[in-house]
Amino acid sequence: MIEVQNVKLGTLISVFFFGMIGGTLRYLLSLKLASTGTILVNLIGSFCLAFLTYYVIERQKLPAWLSTGLGTGMVGAFTTFSTFTVDILGLSTFTDATFYLLISVVGGFLLAYTGMILGIKLGKVGDRR
């Protein structure tokens, strides 16, 4: 198999293929469920990634290309919240998990706010032209 910087081409193709499926599923659910779609997608994704990580991948010993395709590709494209949740579950102490949660939520909010303000300002500059 061809390797690209120590990543096998089959794994990249798997992530791409399953990513298309996950992204498409997310889009279709958001069309059907409107405002409740996001929370449903995040909850389903959290369950799916945890299930894949802690049961299927560990117990069933799937090939690396398939487990990466399903986890990073499909669930990752379906939602990034699931990855966030599994990361917190993997931390060794409650303090570490709390710190990670606070940094993620507060940092995410601050960056979203900054992006919003920057977008508004750049949008107004574009209106003047």
Swiss-Prot record:
Chief localisation class: membrane
Entry's transmembrane regions: 9-29, 37-57, 74-94, 100-120
One Pfam family, short name: CRCB
Domain of life: Bacteria
Keyword match Nucleotidyltransferase: no
Family: Belongs to the fluoride channel Fluc/FEX (TC 1.A.43) family.
GO biological process, one term: cellular detoxification of fluoride
UniProt GO cellular component terms: plasma membrane
Catalytic activity: fluoride(in) = fluoride(out)
Cell location: Cell membrane
Function: Fluoride-specific ion channel. Important for reducing fluoride concentration in the cell, thus reducing its toxicity.
A GO molecular function held by the record: metal ion binding
Entries under PANTHER family matching the protein: FLUORIDE EXPORT PROTEIN 1-RELATED
Modes of activity regulation: Na(+) is not transported, but it plays an essential structural role and its presence is essential for fluoride channel function.
Protein name: Fluoride-specific ion channel FluC 2
Binding site for Na(+): G76, T79
